[in-house]
Amino acid sequence: MAGSSIPAQLLAAIKGRKYTSIARLFANPVDFQGWTPTGHWVATDPQTAARIIEVWFSPGGSASTITWSNETSTTKFGTLEYEIAWQAQPDDQPRVLRQAYILTFKGDKIAAARVYCAGLHTEFPEVDLEKQRRQKGLGGLKPAPSSPRAIAVKAV
């Protein structure tokens, strides 16, 4: 994978379920932290970070695939976002999980990673902002309060 960005290498290893390759992308020690609906995940070594990703990418033991991804990278920082989809038993309902990685690099290794997960969904529908505002009692724009009148004062 020479020439590929670190986020692209991480994505390729996740897609290929190559968890040993994932571990090789992390520095030792690494500052790896992830927040999911399950809890706060922490790793300080590459092997544990890779095992955490393995657990995340193996939902329910059924076949899962990355259906969407996006990566960005500079020499010191990068991001990786992806959606994992699979069918949940017993009635093959679709499930989607989105994760976002914020990465810090030291040389050609990931020195720090912050991973955020939006939680389990059947889909990610567009949000109706105005409906959400109404439900929270935020309604429309409120008129500005009237300010007191300015009165001209004559200097004597």
Each model region followed by its residue ranges:
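Short acidic-aromatic low-complexity motifs
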Residues: 2-29
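Hydrophobic alpha-helical core bundles mediating ligand binding, dimerization, or RNAP-core interactions
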Residues: 7, 14, 26, 49, ...
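Short, mixed-charge, low-aromatic patches
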Residues: 4-13, 39-40, 56-59, 145-147
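A solvent-exposed, acidic/Ser-Thr-rich amphipathic alpha-helical stretch
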Residues: 19-77
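A beta-strand edge to alpha-helix "cap/lid" segment located at domain peripheries
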Residues: 57-156
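Soluble or luminal CAZymes and related metallo-dependent hydrolases
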Residues: 2, 6, 48, 95
